[in-house]
Structures are given as structure tokens and as C-alpha cells.
Amino acid sequence: MAKISRKLQTQKRHKRLRRYLIGSTARPRLAVFRSNNHIYAQVIDDDAQQTICSASTVDKELKEDKEKLSSNCSSSSIVGKLLAKRAMKKGVKEVIFDRGGNLYHGRVKALADAARDAGLNF
């Protein structure tokens, strides 16, 4: 029997999780996408099907820190702080965390912890 690839496992896990993780206007969804080189996070209102705010390691605001930003935990925590700051500015205090099928470990955990420390509740 062939071994299931890691990417396919992540996709299956994400499909399972999305049945239960539905963001609303009162409590939007914080969705995380992790690639090999970058990490992306969005605060999404699923009722209105609209992205409230987003942040990533390729963000224009973080362009001066481009040399420091890569696919590591410290970059993820910088993105988490930036996302929380933008969400608070838009009036979002509570979110539902959608890890995107990734394990809650490493870069995903660093982003979540930084967003929590910056004031988001989940």
C-alpha cells in the first residue's frame, strides 16, 4: 500500500476541520496558510464572504525586514503581531483559529501565540 503524501494528509485534515470552523461577523475566522518559504494569515468573515484583514511574510509593511523574514518561527511571530494589530484596528477582538490542516506546532503555533499576545482572543 502506498504511503499518503504529507500534503495530501494536510488537505484531508483541512477539509475535515472546515466543517466545524465557520467564522461570523461577531467572531471571524483566522485562517493560516503555510508554504515552504512564507506564511500567510487572514481574518475572514464567512457570512459576508469577505477578508477583513491579512498579513504575510511578503507584506509591504515588512519589506524593510525582508532580510530577516524567511520561513522560520520568528518571522511567523512578526506576522502574528502585525495581523493582530490590523484586526484590532478594524474592531475584531475575538476570532476562531483555523490552522489550515497544519499541525499546531512550529510556525503555526508561533503565529498563534504572537497574535494572542498582541490582544486577539481565541
UniProtKB/Swiss-Prot annotation:
InterPro entries per record: Ribosomal_uL18_bac-type, Ribosomal_uL18_bac/euk
Q: Which GO terms describe its biological process?
A: translation
Keyword check for Chloroplast: no
Function, as annotated: This is one of the proteins that bind and probably mediate the attachment of the 5S RNA into the large ribosomal subunit, where it forms part of the central protuberance.
Per the similarity annotation, which family is this?
Answer: Belongs to the universal ribosomal protein uL18 family.
Q: Which Pfam families match?
A: Ribosomal_L18p (PF00861)
Organism whose genome encodes this protein? Prochlorococcus marinus subsp. pastoris (strain CCMP1986 / NIES-2087 / MED4)
Named from the GO MF annotations, one term is:
structural constituent of ribosome
According to the UniProt record, one GO cellular component term is:
cytosolic large ribosomal subunit
CDD domains xref list: Ribosomal_L18_L5e
Keywords, sorted A to Z: Ribonucleoprotein, Ribosomal protein, RNA-binding, rRNA-binding
Q: What is this protein called?
A: Large ribosomal subunit protein uL18
Q: Does the keyword Lipoprotein apply?
A: no
Q: How does it assemble?
A: Part of the 50S ribosomal subunit; part of the 5S rRNA/L5/L18/L25 subcomplex. Contacts the 5S and 23S rRNAs.
The protein's matches in Gene3D superfamilies, at most eight in alphabetical order, are given as: 3.30.420.100
